[in-house]
């Protein structure tokens, strides 16, 4: 039997669908340590015309469904694109927001979002990639899903992506 601290995140989780609230969230995140994750749309990916994965090309599109952003135990937001909020708005906010540090489960795939920021050697502590850190601690594991990393290194029990979505992908889940 695994003992883990209670996860109260769901009590503070807020879904944002309007521009005014999204603006307030980003303003509140200023000068904080910010964790984020991008929920890609179907067209996002490093694919070449023949469908092969490319390691060196920019993503095919900047379209995505949402950005999750968290900067305290009580400030946990899921900002959805839609009628009022566009992918380009979220890109601009991520690109221009001044924070103490950025933390992401797969920061490497999101570095292009910081195109206006010149990342220098002195900035190393400002960008933290959870998957790279988990790999450096234990390179023998084949994959590093967020729920396993949270359990192994934080003692938190989180539901997996499969637990939340079942057989759906994010695009279908957002439509339902």
PLM regions and their residue ranges:
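Long, highly charged low-complexity segments
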Residues: 1-96, 100-101
